[in-house]
Design a protein with these regions (language model features):
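Bimodal "functional hotspot" detector
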Residues: 1-147
């Protein structure tokens, strides 16, 4: 039997895109301060807003008064949210190119954390590199010492 177009039935419905707005934190040009750029993402329910935020941080700002903070070559591998915690996993380039300045290191960490926490369902962030928990980024301690 030959199937015609009207014989084909799709199981499931196409996902409706939803709009998610996040505050992306970039460096204010020429300063050691963070500036905010509001960005709206159109995502389907199966797409991760947290991963979209990380990819936008890596792509850089559209506002001319802001600058990208994350080192070149860094990739966002994944971002999942579980019970208010966002697990953000990056490629090894994040730790291969740590800036010397402690202030710069802190800005990078704050950029990631504050951008992800602008999503209403993210309360805390755990930064990972290639699936391993990052305990510090240069001189910036990310996890308290275990007793």
């Amino acid at each position: 039997r030959i199937l015609r177009r009207e014989d084909v039935v799709f199981s499931g419905v196409e996902e409706e895109p939803v709009e998610v707005t996040a505050m992306l934190c970039f460096r204010r040009s020429g300063t050691n301060e963070l500036g905010v750029e509001l960005r709206t993402f159109r995502l389907t329910e199966s797409e991760s807003a947290a991963l979209a935020v990380l990819e936008a941080l890596l792509a850089g700002p559209s506002d001319a008064g802001l600058e990208r903070l994350l080192p070149g070559g860094v990739e966002a591998w994944s971002a999942r949210v579980d019970d208010g915690v966002c697990y953000a996993d990056f490629s090894g380039a994040l730790t291969e190119h740590i800036p010397e300045s402690a202030q710069e290191q802190e800005l990078i960490v704050r950029s990631i954390v504050e951008s992800l926490c602008s999503l209403s369902y993210v309360q805390t962030v755990q930064i990972q590199v290639e699936g391993e928990v990052l305990r510090s980024y240069g001189t910036v301690e990310l996890l308290p010492e275990q007793e």
